[in-house]
Curated annotation (Swiss-Prot):
Protein name as it appears in the record: Uncharacterized protein YiaF
A single GO BP: biological process involved in symbiotic interaction
Domain of life where this protein originates: Bacteria
Amino acid sequence: MATGKSCSRWFAPLAALLMVVSLSGCFDKEGDQRKAFIDFLQNTVMRSGERLPTLTADQKKQFGPFVSDYAILYGYSQQVNQAMDSGLRPVVDSVNAIRVPQDYVTQSGPLREMNGSLGVLAQQLQNAKLQADAAHSALKQSDDLKPVFDQAFTKVVTTPADALQPLIPAAQTFTQQLVMVGDYIAQQGTQVSFVANGIQFPTSQQASEYNKLIAPLPAQHQAFNQAWTTAVTATQ
């Protein structure tokens, strides 16, 4: 009987020791995952000129629970990339295709369609920003991770959002004016003639109306180009 009691006394401390070792191992694992994620934020996310990558299976294992933190950054960056590539870059391409007065007419259809979709795009980006802000505010991060993640959030979310805010209205104003010019030329039908890189109208009234329509274009073009350049820089 004494032997049995002696064994019980030995097993109890051993079990406690194993539990401590096991728990310590868990804490060390989380620390390693956090350090790996911090290193990734500093050396990959904060690097300019590159889009955020999709995490590999190995990286997901390395980062553990912090994969969900990265999802906040990656999800918003995907929305911005899509907005730039599918919503705004086609506007730039269509504008660049206008070299002579006839091009106002040929580009008016695509520009009209783009102008109509810009309002929806602005709302989508606003909703994405609100979701990212809410998810960011809900995070409970350690003192070593929080400042690094906050810096990454500013780069990936806040700065692009601020840059896109004036770009879409500038694109809307500019494309709407371009469509108006194209529509006016089309309405004149065969009355208008194109000579070299210019345009001729049969009456001074028609020419005056055309000149009024194209007068705002240089300033609008400059505002759009400046906003576009700022947005491109902010999203790199």
